[in-house]
């Protein structure tokens, strides 16, 4: 009887759950995350547009953090990249030198702007 490698089995299951297409984005980019919410029979789409603070992890557990300010109140949300209930759309590319731009939390107004990356 052949012994099954646990990690190979885990990798096979995870591979099936990965999204086929994930847009290329990173810290500093402005993205729109469309969250599909199910309310009984109805499916509603809620948009969350903001700046990506970081992207971390690998495989099925890969996540990214988005920050937006609404009426002067900052909101940060973590999303799973391979979540089937979200769609990610890159609005504009930002030019930053860090993988995690935590310094954006202290900034407001004009100093919180990120330059656009020239393509």
UniProtKB/Swiss-Prot annotation:
Q: What are this entry's molecular-function GO terms?
A: structural constituent of ribosome
Q: Which GO terms describe its biological process?
A: translation
Recorded superkingdom:
Bacteria
> Which PROSITE patterns does the UniProt record give?
RIBOSOMAL_L19 (PS01015)
GO CC annotations, alphabetized = cytosolic large ribosomal subunit
Q: Which UniProt keywords apply?
A: Ribonucleoprotein, Ribosomal protein
Q: What does this protein do?
A: This protein is located at the 30S-50S ribosomal subunit interface and may play a role in the structure and function of the aminoacyl-tRNA binding site.
The UniProt similarity line reads: Belongs to the bacterial ribosomal protein bL19 family.
HAMAP family recorded: Ribosomal_bL19 (MF_00402)
Q: Quote the protein name from its UniProt record.
A: Large ribosomal subunit protein bL19
């Amino acid at each position: 009887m052949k012994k099954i490698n646990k990690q190979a089995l885990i990798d096979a299951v995870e591979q099936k759950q990965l999204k086929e297409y994930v847009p290329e984005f990173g810290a500093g980019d402005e993205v729109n995350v469309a969250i599909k919410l199910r309310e009984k029979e109805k499916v509603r789409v809620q948009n969350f547009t903001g700046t990506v603070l970081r992207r971390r992890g690998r495989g099925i557990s890969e996540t990214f953090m988005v920050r937006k300010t609404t009426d002067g109140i900052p909101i940060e949300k973590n999303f799973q990249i391979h979540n089937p209930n979200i769609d990610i759309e890159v609005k504009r590319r930002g030019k930053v030198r860090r993988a995690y731009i935590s310094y954006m939390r202290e900034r407001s107004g004009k100093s919180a702007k990120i330059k656009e990356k020239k393509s």
